[in-house]
Amino acid sequence: MAEEPQTVLQLPPSSAAGGEGLTDVSPETTTPEPPSSAAVSPGTEEPAGDTKKKIDILLKAVGDTPIMKTKKWAVERTRTIQGPIDFIKKFLKLVASEQLFIYVNQSFAPSPDQEVGTLYECFGSDGKLVLHYCKSQAWG
């Protein structure tokens, strides 16, 4: 089975006002390698092991929520879950009044201030963190 293209999710600095500045870096194909040495972005050298700076997240739609064509993204390990939530809302062009629910491994909703790196260490598998997103409450 062919590997899915991966895109680096560039989130603005935490101090940026208005949440603007999200950019989408062109996708690159990944090769089947051990998770600790998987490439994240062009020209980026990562330390071996669990100390890599970016975490691969796999975004899966639930229910009637629109499916994103690019499902695999790379996010800095120090980012909070609120960053990907804001990005998904903007990417799906959701109105400010619409809610977006994020679930880790179809089981629980992490708090918006939870760091992606911590979630990956506890619940990541196969070198990525699986996040399910939906517009209505699905689990827990």
Swiss-Prot record:
It comes from Pongo abelii. Transmembrane segments: none annotated. Shares weak sequence similarity with ubiquitin family, but contains an 'ubiquitin superfold' and the C-terminal Gly is required for isopeptide linkage. Ubiquitin-like protein involved in autophagy vesicles formation. Conjugation with ATG5 through a ubiquitin-like conjugating system involving also ATG7 as an E1-like activating enzyme and ATG10 as an E2-like conjugating enzyme, is essential for its function. The ATG12-ATG5 conjugate acts as an E3-like enzyme which is required for lipidation of ATG8 family proteins and their association to the vesicle membranes. The ATG12-ATG5 conjugate also negatively regulates the innate antiviral immune response by blocking the type I IFN production pathway through direct association with RARRES3 and MAVS. InterPro entries: Atg12, Ubiquitin-like_domsf. It is found in: Cytoplasm; Preautophagosomal structure membrane. This is Ubiquitin-like protein ATG12. Keywords: Acetylation, Autophagy, Cytoplasm, Immunity, Innate immunity, Isopeptide bond, Membrane, Ubl conjugation pathway. Belongs to the ATG12 family. It comes from the Eukaryota.
